[in-house]
């Protein structure tokens, strides 16, 4: 089963501020991080500058990001998931695959409805639920009925649905691979099934060829991999032309995620994508582990300054060296990265 909160940041804002319900809302600082479905109807999308978004939708209400609120909502969401599933595989802070094979319930359709209802009643957020025999089918089911939909792809439906799937619809298959497949007139899962394995490896590479062959055979991944201890927290943002990197917004979201997890971090890394797909990376170690946005901003700022020789299209900040908040660690020169 795949469960995905709808327009997560915007939905949290609408939940917490009744005056925002039913109107176009977006959460963001310099750029839009998330738009409600009411705003999306006007063409507002994540990555737009606030000016672009307001030009597209003059009635748009833009609210600042509240990372701590989103982390609290995420924790409540996953608490509901754990009641219904033996194992959970997070996809992000607002979505996850649930292994419900051992959950006692009359039918999968009723179980999916129960999960959706529990999240709405206990967390106050709308979610879309999709279920299927494999993770691909569950993801396709949820994607097809957003927002706040519910769909179960039963094996009988899967038998005729799977061969007709377009390669563009396959979750986990990147655009580069899709384009290579199209260049060889491979447009559907049925097309994949008749390609010689060696030819498929030449087109897509060994690992992806195995995945594609499994999709064609109906033996693709159905294993829900349980949560693992966090090793990092990352935030990525598009940087619209003519706007500076929103360092404060990036670190505020990171700090909120760290605090929500009860963790601090000691290493900050910056990744930058320039026009033309050129990349730049920077890294610095903090004096001590922290979840303080001011300390994180002081570390990220110089890394960004060192990367602004060209126009930046996308920027990401990652915090590693995680440990529980309050743990005392004396860093030494030979600690290393």
Regions found by a protein language model. Give the residues of each.
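DNA-contacting surface of Y-family translesion DNA polymerases
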Residues: 2, 169, 179-314, 323-328, ...
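Gly/Gly-Pro- and Ser/Thr-rich, intrinsically disordered tail segments characteristic of DNA damage-repair
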Residues: 1-211, 319-337
């Amino acid at each position: 089963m795949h469960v995905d909160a709808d327009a997560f940041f915007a939905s949290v804002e609408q939940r917490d501020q009744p005056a925002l319900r039913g109107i176009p809302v977006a959460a963001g600082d310099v750029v839009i991080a998330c738009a409600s479905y009411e705003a999306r109807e006007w063409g507002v999308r994540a990555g737009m500058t606030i000016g672009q978004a307001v030009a597209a939708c003059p009635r748009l209400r833009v609210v600042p990001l509240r990372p701590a609120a989103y982390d609290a909502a995420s924790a409540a969401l996953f608490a509901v998931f754990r009641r219904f599933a033996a194992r959970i595989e997070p996809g992000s802070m607002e979505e996850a695959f649930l292994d419900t094979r051992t959950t006692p319930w009359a039918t999968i359709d009723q179980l999916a409805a129960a999960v959706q209802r529990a999240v709405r009643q206990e967390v106050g957020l709308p979610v879309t639920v999709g279920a299927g025999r494999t993770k691909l089918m569950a993801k396709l089911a949820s994607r097809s009925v957003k927002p706040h939909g519910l769909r179960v792809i039963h094996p009988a439906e899967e038998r005729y649905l799977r061969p007709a799937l377009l390669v563009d619809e396959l979750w986990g298959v990147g655009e580069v691979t899709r384009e290579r497949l199209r260049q060889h007139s491979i447009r559907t899962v049925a097309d994949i099934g008749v390609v010689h394995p060696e030819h498929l490896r030449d087109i897509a590479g060994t690992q992806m060829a195995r995945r594609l062959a499994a999709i064609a055979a109906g033996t693709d991944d159905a294993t829900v991999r349980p949560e693992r201890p966090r090793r990092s927290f990352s935030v990525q943002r598009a940087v619209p032309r003519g706007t500076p990197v929103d360092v404060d917004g990036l670190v505020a979201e990171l700090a909120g995620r760290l605090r929500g997890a009860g963790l601090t971090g000691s290493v900050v890394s910056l990744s930058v994508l320039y026009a033309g797909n050129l990349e730049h990376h920077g890294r610095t170690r903090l004096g001590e582990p922290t979840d303080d946005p001011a300390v994180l901003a002081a570390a990220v700022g110089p890394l960004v300054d060192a990367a602004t020789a060209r126009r930046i299209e996308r920027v990401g900040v990652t915090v590693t060296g995680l440990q529980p908040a309050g743990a005392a660690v004396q860093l030494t020169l030979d600690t290393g990265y």
